[in-house]
Amino acid sequence: MAGFVGRFEHSVDSKGRVILPVRFREAFLRGGFLTPNQEGCVALRTPGENERQMAEMLEAAKSSSAGRNQARVWAANTAEVEIDKQGRMAIPSHLRDFAHLEGDVLIHGAIDRIELWNPSQWEERVKPMEAWFLEGDE
């Protein structure tokens, strides 16, 4: 897999839908899974990547109550989505509320998944990391 890379800006429409960038659509011909991400964004995973993530959650759930709680919250808030012929996907209201997705949305590749961010939260949480990355770690 080449992975998901690139950064795009789109908007959530009045029906809670967002257009998936063309370069990402082929990976989601069979649909995808939207999940809450611990950083405050929403992740879009392919069916195969979602299965891998579920297996990780299941293993964590077997070993601790914290793992069970994390798996429980993750599974309860995951939504299966379809991409329509116009390249749009509906984001369930609980995930839009979780990530504050209204109006403009930043969509970017994160190698094994796609992330959807509120642009203000992206600036607050990720922009400082971009500066660190560009400076190097020395």
Language-model segments: residues:
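Flexible "stalk/tail and boundary" regions
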Residues: 1-10, 14-15, 23-81, 85-86, ...
